Curated annotation (Swiss-Prot):
Membrane topology: Multi-pass membrane protein
Enzyme class: translocase
List of residues binding Mg(2+): 728, 732
The protein's name: Calcium-transporting ATPase, endoplasmic reticulum-type
Keyword Acetylation: no
Organism: Solanum lycopersicum
GO MF term set: ATP binding; ATP hydrolysis activity; metal ion binding; P-type calcium transporter activity
A GO-annotated cellular component: endoplasmic reticulum membrane
Subcellular location: Endoplasmic reticulum membrane
Length: 1048
């Protein structure tokens, strides 16, 4: 039974200790731990049971098209078994058709199982986020390196800098003046959060507001503390996320393409069933006859052999109608799409996501690390000038921790005045951070804010010309890196050597500042302070001017500084004040812990008095900046009809400022109906929520928890939107899993986010999504092209068999030949159509609707027209060979075969009753076709006519592939060389067809013979008109579209 959560954040520390029946100085007893472990279990995430292999295999066959193929294979197998004595075939030759179909299905199943078995790793990645060990108080003794999975609620745990939090815990006491925890991957907050022991006044508050709680998977970056474990295992926030990921995976729906293909498969099944039944039924007279006596049928005669024969024709029709190669061609096209996207830094983990991107209607984006760099940087800073009536502002370029990324605008480090030099000194020395290089990415060690200040110092430079040259040279050569990772910050090092740091006044929540005492080159001590602007300004009595002189901080100057700071804050900048103090009283001569005044530094309550009467130096504005390319990507999405919604865990003002900066909103736009916190949005009724999400324009949801993100994505999907969700944190994982396509960041993204996603951005570049959407749209268009090509070919095959059955002539195509055409000769051109170039205006069209049919009425009409010509030409050449001496000026009887009347060909089944019917042997390549019985002329003797039919079918389909280069544009506008791969594929298909014609044992398997040059000429003459027919249809289609546009 799941325990009701205890709101430890809203209770005092004493009340929490009483609730968990534990003493802070002793911890739990071994006996109590055993009781609680039995009640709460181990502190680990549940391992979801994976699907067994047999279930994965079965799921691969749960597809309409696959089921049709299975049915065709089964019937073909039965018929081959029943008829093998009659046909004289045995072994492999008799079962070629069902074995080939089964081979295709098994191959597809193997690929599907391999993909799926490698897909579900998100929950394992979550486990890696949990701390492996902890320092725990048990039975009055502090146990270091205690296994984290053994923790139970009520345990007393000590945390220090660098520790990974092993469970959700209530902060009981601070062992340092301040405690900060990095929890951006869990909550989306861009800055480390300062924690305290104070209780909150409400039970119902956001995750980010629980400042007296530390959560499993987060990391302590500053300070140390003692905590009480309140939640373990699946009851932690990470555990809740795991459950949400699992629930989201259960809600995964089919991709738009799969829905369309399943719909197409269902219609195809019905059509095949009807046509097969009709073909079989219209030939009933050949296997069922009766006498009519007194107006009533009697004396029924039934021929099982003939019934089976025409049933086999119906099966051949099914084989012809099923595009067996379509699943593999779609898979190949999607795989090619993944390669193209990988070249653009979009790594696709699930093939279907390639096409899903193309119909995306909404992108739900995280802010931190997705729209922004997740790297704090100084955007601008200001100080007073020569007078207290004016400020001077300096803009700073660059958005990363790379010291060489940008510089200070209009800056000359050789002319830095005393005020700017002191600002550089404070930023360099009142600082515990560093920068390291991980591959090509620069990252911060310590607090991101402090790392950004150090990068600013590197951009400011140093006043010493010799040192400046030495630093510049070091940055050029490999010594820029101290080792493989750590970045050498030469300017900061210069300041730290110049002014030795002798004491530190740690940051705390009361005074909101940090101070350091340094020994200046002249031997005197100076206090350097940085902190919250309002707090430092309040404690300052003087202000420094540009020349280094100080003047009293009067009210007018104070208002000037406040006004300038307000202007910076409105841009979404976090403002840090900088100050100093020379008159340190008894600390003026401080040098080490042995100094008499050292006891004052041990008492944090004295820090406020030490940091009073300060001299205000200036203000630094920092931000987590938007990526440079995001603004353009947002505009591209807007033109493409894609809505953008920003869903972030950060605070409302920061989120709105970033959205304005990337021009999701204009600067003067009222955000009353466009910006909400997660809690505010969830408080609305369902109808109000739908109205908000339905409105045009961007939306921003701040302070969003994982459940909020998941609920927004779910609602959008229920509204019929195709949702792409981007993110990089653990908090994004459930929504990434639930979205139609989850997109994770490859560099800054957590493993949890990556494993829950469908696609990973290798460069963390938001604009890569736009490129991927364009590629997805292009792939869909190309898919329509090869589906149109393959289906029109299949329609032609169906019509040819239908005509054969209606006319009563011998079958001109057998199932194994149809399989060869559908799988092999059609495959290369269909695959090559996946390389068709994208339309120029592909990102200026709105996304296609979910309701848009894959095959509309006009496309169906074109299928039927082209298919009819394919069928007529295929059957026509078969009839011509039997009945005509020449055709289109080409002599057909040069091989010596016997001509028959069309009526004889249509009634070939009655051949045994004909009198004086004789046939002559004829040549087929080097082979002489002879007959022991004249009636064999319509079975054994049809090999040449059947070869011509098959060759016409192949040739027409090759020419038809040229028609598929563009849905509406003529070959004059879209010439074949625009896609050279198609020309290569056509050559390959012709080569493969030639192989089965001219390799004897393959010719025997497929029941065909070699053709002469004149016969090939006849094939080409009958096949080429398909291009002219489709050109006429394209012309009509263009006229129809223009008429519709004019009417609109």
């Amino acid at each position: 039974m799941e325990e009701k959560p205890f709101p430890a954040w809203s209770w005092s520390v004493d009340q929490c200790l009483k609730e968990y029946q534990v003493k802070l100085e002793k911890g739990l007893s071994t006996y109590e731990v055993d009781k609680r472990r039995e009640r709460y279990g181990l502190n680990e995430l549940e391992k979801e049971k994976g699907k067994p292999l047999w279930r994965l295999v079965l799921e691969q066959f749960d597809d309409t098209l696959v089921k049709i193929l299975l049915g065709a294979a089964f019937i073909s197998f039965v018929l081959a078994y029943v008829n093998q004595d009659e046909t004289g075939e045995s072994g492999f030759e008799a079962y070629v058709e069902p074995l080939v179909i089964l081979w295709i299905l098994v191959l597809n199943a193997i690929v599907g199982v391999w993909q799926e078995s490698n897909a579900e790793k998100a929950l394992e990645a979550l486990k890696e986020m949990q701390g492996e060990s902890a320092k725990v108080l048990r039975d009055g003794y502090l146990v270091p390196d205690f296994p984290a999975k053994e923790l139970v609620p009520g345990d007393i745990v000590e945390l220090r800098v660098g520790d990974k939090v092993p469970a959700d815990m209530r902060v009981a006491t601070l062992k340092s003046s301040t405690l900060r925890v990095e929890q951006s991957s869990l909550t989306g907050e861009s800055m480390p959060v300062t924690k305290s022991t104070d209780f909150l006044a409400t039970d119902d508050c956001e995750l980010q507001a629980k400042e007296n709680m530390v959560f499993a998977g987060t990391t302590v970056v500053n300070g140390s503390c003692i905590c009480i474990v309140v939640n373990t295992g699946m009851c932690t926030e990470i555990g809740k996320i795991q459950r949400q990921i699992h629930d989201a995976s259960m809600e995964e729906s089919d991709t738009p393409l799969k829905k369309k293909l399943d719909e197409f498969g269902n219609r195809l099944t019905f059509a095949i069933g009807v046509v097969c039944l009709v073909v079989w039924a219209i030939n009933y007279k050949y296997f069922l006859s009766w006498e009519v006596v007194d107006d009533w049928p009697s004396d029924f005669r039934f021929s099982f052999e003939k019934c089976a024969y025409y049933f086999k024709i119906a099966v051949a029709l099914a084989v012809a109608a099923i595009p067996e190669g379509l699943p593999s061609v779609i898979t190949t096209c999607l795989a090619l799409g993944t390669r193209k996207m990988a070249q653009k830094n979009a790594i696709v983990r699930k093939l279907q996501s390639v096409e899903t991107l193309g119909c995306t209607t909404v992108i739900c984006s995280d802010k931190t690390g997705t729209l922004t760099t997740n790297q704090m940087s100084v955007s601008e800073f200001f100080t007073l000038g020569r007078k207290t009536t004016a400020c001077r502002v300096f803009g700073v370029e660059g958005t990363t921790y790379d010291p060489k990324d940008g510089g200070i605008m209009n800056w000359n480090c050789c002319k830095m005045d005393a005020n700017l030099l002191l600002m550089a000194e404070i930023c360099a020395i009142c600082n515990d951070a560093g920068v390291f290089c991980d591959g090509r990415l620069f990252k911060a060690t310590g607090l991101p804010t402090e790392a950004a200040l150090k990068v600013l110092v590197e951009k400011m430079g140093v006043p010493d010309s010799k040192a400046r040259c030495k630093i510049r040279d070091a940055q050029i050569v490999s010594s820029y890196l101290i080792d493989r990772n750590t970045v050498k910050l030469g300017c900061c090092d210069w300041w730290m050597k110049r002014s030795k740091r002798v004491a530190t006044l740690e940051f705390d929540r009361v005074r909101k500042s940090m101070g350091v005492i340094v020994r200046e080159p002249n031997g005197s001590n100076r206090l350097l302070v940085k902190g919250a602007f309002e707090s430092l300004l309040e404690r300052s009595t003087y202000v420094q001017l540009a020349d280094g002189s100080t003047v009293p901080l009067d009210e007018s100057c104070r208002q000037l500084l406040l006004l300038k700071q307000l202007e910076m804050s409105s841009k979404g900048l976090r403002c840090l004040g900088l100050a100093y103090k020379d008159d340190l009283g008894e600390l003026s001569g401080y040098y080490a812990a042995t100094h008499p005044a050292h006891k004052k530094l041990l008492d944090p309550s004295c820090y406020s008095s030490i940091e009073s009467d300060l001299v205000f130096v200036g203000v630094v504005g920092l931000r987590d900046p938007p990526r440079e390319e995001v603004h353009r990507a947002v505009n591209d999405c807007r033109r493409a009809g894609i809505k953008i919604m920003v869903i972030t865990g950060d605070n409302k003002s920061t989120a709105e400022a970033v959205c304005r900066e990337i021009q999701l909103f204009s600067n003067g736009e009222n955000l009353r109906g466009s910006s909400f916190t997660g809690k505010e949005f969830m408080a609305f009724s369902s109808q109000q929520q739908i109205e908000i999400l339905s409105q045009d324009g961007g939306k921003v949801f701040s302070r969003a928890e994982p459940r909020h993100k998941q609920e927004i994505v779910r609602m959008l999907k229920e509204m019929g939107e195709i949702v792409a969700m981007t993110g990089d944190g653990v908090n994004d994982a459930p929504a990434l899993k639930l979205a139609d396509i989850g997109i994770a960041m490859g560099i800054t993204g957590t493993e949890v986010a990556k494993e829950a996603s469908d696609m990973v951005l290798a460069d963390d570049n938001f604009s890569t999504i736009v490129s991927a959407v364009a590629e997805g749209r292009s792939i869909y268009n190309n898919m329509k092209a090869f589906i149109r090509y393959m289906i029109s070919s299949n329609v032609g095959e169906v019509i040819s068999i239908f005509l054969t059955a209606v006319l009563g002539i011998p079958e001109c195509l057998i199932p194994v030949q149809l399989l060869w055409v559908n799988l092999v000769t059609d495959g290369p051109p269909a695959t090559a159509l996946g390389f068709n170039p994208a339309d120029v205006d592909i990102m200026q069209k709105p996304p296609r609707k979910n309701t848009d049919a894959l095959i509309n009425s006009w496309v169906f009409f074109r299928y039927m027209v082209i298919g009819s010509y394919v069928g007529i030409a295929t059957v026509g050449i078969f009839i011509v060979w039997y009945t005509q001496a020449s055709f289109l000026g080409i002599n057909i009887v040069s091989d010596g075969h016997t001509l028959v009347e069309l009526s004889q060909l249509r009634n070939w089944g009655e051949c045994s009753t004909w009198t004086n019917f004789t046939v002559s042997p004829f040549k087929a390549g080097n082979r002489l076709i002879t007959f022991s019985d004249p009636c064999e002329y319509f079975t054994v003797g049809k090999v040449k006519a059947m070869t011509l039919s098959l060759s016409v079918l192949v040739a027409i389909e090759m020419f038809n592939s040229l028609n598929a280069l563009s849905e509406d544009n003529s070959l004059i506008k879209m010439p074949p060389w625009r896609n050279p791969w198609l020309l290569v594929a056509m050559s390959l298909s012709f080569a493969l067809h030639s192989v089965i014609l001219y390799v004897p044992f393959l010719a025997d398997i497929f029941g065909i013979v070699p053709l002469s040059l004149y016969e090939w000429l006849l094939v080409i003459l009958l096949s080429a008109p398909v291009i002219l027919i489709d050109e006429v249809l394209k012309f009509v289609g263009r006229r129809r579209r223009r008429t519709k546009l004019k009417a609109a």
